[in-house]
Regions:
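Charged docking surfaces used in two-component/phosphorelay signaling
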Residues: 15-23
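Short hydrophobic/Thr-rich beta-strand motif most characteristic of the beta2 strand and flanking loop
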Residues: 25-32, 40
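Active-site beta3 strand of CheY-like receiver
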Residues: 44-50
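Receiver (REC) domain active-site loop signature in two-component systems and cognate sites
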Residues: 55, 78
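C-terminal output helix
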Residues: 106-116
C-alpha cells in the first residue's frame, strides 16, 4: 500500500499510529524524534511521514524544514500531528511545508484517511 514513517516521542501515541496504519496495510517504521527521523528517512524511503511537533533534540517544525530542504526527501508527504491547535500553529505548519495538519487528540479514522490520500492509496 505504501510506506509510512511515524515520528513521535510519546511511545503510546507512536504505537497507536503505527498499529492503526499497519492494520490498514501500510509498511510502517517508527522514529522517536526529529533527529531519529532524519537519520532513518533515506534508508526507509517513506511515502508519508507523520510528525509530532513537540519533541526533544529536534522538533517537528525544524524536522519538516530539513526534509523540505534536502532534494532526496523534499517529495515526501508530511502530516503534522500535534497538540498545538492555534491558528498560528497551523499557519506555521503550512510555512514549514506540511501537507496536512491534525490536532491531538485525533480521530484515528481521520488520520488513516489523510495518510491514505497523501500516499495515493485508494479510499477504504
Amino acid at each position: 500500500m505504501g510506506r509510512v514513517l511515524v515520528v513521535d516521542d510519546d511511545e503510546v501515541i507512536r504505537q497507536l499510529i503505527a498499529v492503526n496504519l499497519t492494520l490498514e496495510g501500510f509498511d510502517v517504521a517508527t522514529a522517536i524524534d526529529g533527529q531519529d527521523c532524519l537519520d532513518k528517512v533515506r534508508a526507509i524511503d517513506p511515502d508519508v511521514i507523520t510528525l509530532d511537533v513537540m519533541m526533544p533534540r529536534l522538533d517537528g517544525w525544524e524536522t519538516a524544514v530539513q526534509l523540505r530542504k534536502a532534494p532526496r526527501t523534499a517529495h515526501i508527504k508530511v502530516v503534522l500531528i500535534t497538540a498545538r491547535a492555534q491558528e498560528d500553529d497551523m499557519t506555521r505548519g503550512t510555512n514549514v511545508g506540511a501537507d496536512a495538519y491534525l490536532t491531538k487528540p485525533f480521530d484515528p479514522g481521520e488520520m488513516i484517511r489523510v495518510v491514505r490520500e497523501l500516499a495515493g492509496a485508494p479510499p477504504a
